[in-house]
Amino acid sequence: TNPPFSLFREYIKQLVDYDKKFLIIGNMNAITYKEVFPLLRDNKVWLGNNYKVNAGAMFFEIPEKIANLEQVREVKTNESGKKVYITRVQGIRWFTNLDHGRRHEPLQLMTEKEVIKFTTKKPFEKYDNYDAIEVSLVKNIPSDYKGVMGVPVSFLDSYNPDQFEILGSNRGVDQDPNKIYGKGSYLNGKEVYKRLFIKHRKK
């Protein structure tokens, strides 16, 4: 069974501490929890293989007696003739330590020059307080950039540990790769949203 998200930190720690194989559901925000992020960074835990389906949402059957009709996405009839209420939950993922093929699919990317020419129309900017460039969309990660890049947490949906190394995040000193700054990374004086810091693995 899957515990409530409020117990996610304790539950995943227990599974890892006892060296269990697992496949559990958690909120996308759990990625930057101080108890969870090191597991993702060190490739002890990763996302499951159906994360790209339905734009990161999952569908669940809910009992009729507790169904909130405003949240019901679809009503079906099963083989027994009973109504089945389907609800859609956004922003959740499978977290697992079971390997799967999609985890090793290389992300197809353009070079830095190609990204600037065809997409951004301007050079990548560096953070005010990190020696890294801001890449706001995963598809714009330059294939030939050798330094550190700040990317959205949704990068983990496409993360290939053979292609990239996760260095840290901007959610706290314990996750900052340089152990200097606290929460937040800034671009032209404005704080950007949650970011992971990554770089290409040397070939």
Question: Where on the chain are the PLM-derived regions?
Answer:
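Class I S-adenosyl-L-methionine-dependent methyltransferase catalytic core
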Residues: 4-203
